Amino acid sequence: MGGFTSIWHWVIVLLVIVLLFGAKKIPELAKGLGSGIKNFKKAVKDDEEEAKNEPKTLDAQATQTKVHETSEIKSKQES
């Protein structure tokens, strides 16, 4: 068997869906699904942009190390 390759399989599936949910409820479900997908894509895009704008943690650690080393050198020179 080839699965759902026949048009009649799809017709039966659609009839079952209409019987389960009703003709009025299907557009509401589709609208909700579409808005959910849209919100998900927007959230993924926002997270990607946020990740690009964040400073790298390695760079921040290197800067802190340089500041610490510089302050140690100054304190030794003053002593």
Swiss-Prot record:
Q: Which UniProt keywords apply?
A: Cell inner membrane, Cell membrane, Membrane, Protein transport, Translocation, Transmembrane, Transmembrane helix, Transport
What Gene Ontology molecular-function terms does this entry list?
protein transmembrane transporter activity
Signal peptide region: none
Membrane-spanning ranges? 1-21
Chief site of localization = membrane
Per the record, membrane topology reads: Single-pass membrane protein
- A single cellular component GO annotation: TAT protein transport complex
Query: What Pfam family does this protein match (any one)?
Result: TatA_B_E
Question: Which processes are annotated in GO (biological process)?
Answer: protein transport by the Tat complex
- Per the record, which residues fall in region Disordered? 46-79
- Where are stretches of biased composition, namely Basic and acidic residues? 66-79
Family indicated by similarity:
Belongs to the TatA/E family.
Q: What does this protein do?
A: Part of the twin-arginine translocation (Tat) system that transports large folded proteins containing a characteristic twin-arginine motif in their signal peptide across membranes. TatA could form the protein-conducting channel of the Tat system.
Recorded protein name is Sec-independent protein translocase protein TatA
The species is Helicobacter pylori (strain HPAG1)
Lineage start: Bacteria, Pseudomonadati, Campylobacterota, Epsilonproteobacteria, Campylobacterales
Gene label: tatA
